C-alpha cells in the first residue's frame, strides 16, 4: 500500500453521532454505560418509574395477591417463557389483567429491538386507559424490562436515550446489558433522523406557502 494512501477506519460502535442540523449528539455506547456508574436508588423488587408505570422483578410478577391488591391492570413480561419468568395469561386468569409476553433472553447478542415498537405500543395503550397500572417485569427488573421501558419513553414521550435513562435511574437501579444499550442507541439515532426529516419537511412547506 502506498505511503500516502489514506487508511479507512472501521466504524466505531463507541463513537458519538452528531446531527449537524439540530446539534443533538447521540452518545457512544461507552458514554451510555457511564450513566449507570453514578448513584441510583437501592435495588428493590419494584419501583414506579413513570406515572402508573412500574418496573419489577420475578418475585413481583409471581405475587398475584399483591398485584391485585395494588390494582395492577396490565403486565408486560419481558422474560416470557417456560425457562424464564413462566407466567402468562393463564397464570393471571383469576385476575382482571391484560397480559403481554416478550420471549427475550438477557444476552448482548439478543435482538431486543424487534420488540421495541410492539412493547411500546402495549405500554402506551395501557397507560392511556383510565385507572390503569402497568408492571413491566423480567427476572431482575434491570435489563430486559428496563430496556423496553426506555424504548417506550423514547418512542412515545419524545425523550432521547440519555433523558430516558436519567428518568428511570431516578427511581430504579437498572443496568441494561451492552447489546441492549447499543440497540437503544440505534433507536435514538433513528428517532433523531425522523425528527430532523419531519422538521425539514415542515420548514420546506412553510417556505412554499
Swiss-Prot record:
Catalytic activity, EC: 3.1.3.16, 3.1.3.48
Enzyme class: hydrolase
GO cellular component, as recorded: cytoplasm; nucleus
Signal peptide (UniProt feature, chain positions): none
Entries under SMART domains matching the protein: DSPc (SM00195)
Domain Tyrosine-protein phosphatase: 45-193
Keywords from the UniProt entry: Cytoplasm, Hydrolase, Nucleus, Protein phosphatase
Biological processes, Gene Ontology terms: negative regulation of MAPK cascade; protein dephosphorylation
Keyword set includes NAD: no
GO molecular function ontology, one term from the record: protein tyrosine phosphatase activity
Cell compartments where the protein resides: Cytoplasm; Nucleus
UniProt KW Glycoprotein keyword: no
Catalytic activity: O-phospho-L-tyrosyl-[protein] + H2O = L-tyrosyl-[protein] + phosphate; O-phospho-L-seryl-[protein] + H2O = L-seryl-[protein] + phosphate; O-phospho-L-threonyl-[protein] + H2O = L-threonyl-[protein] + phosphate
Binding residue positions for substrate: 137-144
InterPro entries: Atypical_DUSP_subfamA, Dual-sp_phosphatase_cat-dom, Prot-tyrosine_phosphatase-like, Tyr_Pase_dom, TYR_PHOSPHATASE_DUAL_dom
Active site: 138 (phosphocysteine intermediate)
Family label: Belongs to the protein-tyrosine phosphatase family. Non-receptor class dual specificity subfamily.
Known function: Dual specificity phosphatase able to dephosphorylate phosphotyrosine, phosphoserine and phosphothreonine residues, with a preference for phosphotyrosine as a substrate. Dual specificity phosphatase able to dephosphorylate phosphotyrosine, phosphoserine and phosphothreonine residues within the same substrate, with a preference for phosphotyrosine as a substrate. Involved in the modulation of AMPK and MAPK1/2 signaling pathway.
Stated name of the protein: Dual specificity phosphatase 29
Organism: Xenopus laevis
Amino acid at each position: 500500500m502506498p505511503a500516502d494512501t489514506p487508511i479507512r477506519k472501521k466504524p466505531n460502535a463507541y463513537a458519538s453521532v452528531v446531527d449537524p442540523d439540530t446539534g443533538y449528539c447521540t452518545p457512544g455506547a461507552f458514554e451510555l454505560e457511564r450513566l449507570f456508574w453514578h448513584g441510583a436508588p437501592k435495588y428493590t423488587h419494584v419501583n414506579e418509574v413513570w406515572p402508573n408505570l412500574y418496573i419489577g422483578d420475578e418475585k413481583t410478577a409471581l405475587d398475584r395477591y399483591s398485584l391485585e391488591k395494588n390494582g395492577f391492570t396490565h403486565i408486560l413480561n419481558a422474560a416470557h417463557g417456560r425457562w424464564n419468568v413462566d407466567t402468562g395469561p393463564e397464570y393471571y386468569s383469576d385476575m382482571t389483567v391484560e397480559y403481554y409476553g416478550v420471549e427475550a433472553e438477557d444476552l448482548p447478542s439478543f435482538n431486543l429491538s424487534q420488540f421495541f415498537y410492539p412493547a411500546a405500543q402495549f405500554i402506551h395503550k395501557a397507560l392511556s386507559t383510565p385507572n390503569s397500572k402497568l408492571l413491566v417485569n423480567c427476572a431482575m427488573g434491570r435489563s430486559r424490562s428496563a430496556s423496553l421501558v426506555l424504548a417506550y419513553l423514547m418512542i412515545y414521550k419524545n425523550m432521547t436515550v440519555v433523558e430516558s435513562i436519567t428518568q428511570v435511574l431516578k427511581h430504579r437501579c437498572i443496568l441494561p446489558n451492552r447489546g441492549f444499550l447499543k440497540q437503544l442507541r440505534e433507536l435514538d439515532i433513528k428517532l433523531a433522523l425522523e425528527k430532523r426529516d419531519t422538521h425539514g419537511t415542515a420548514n420546506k412547506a412553510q417556505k412554499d406557502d
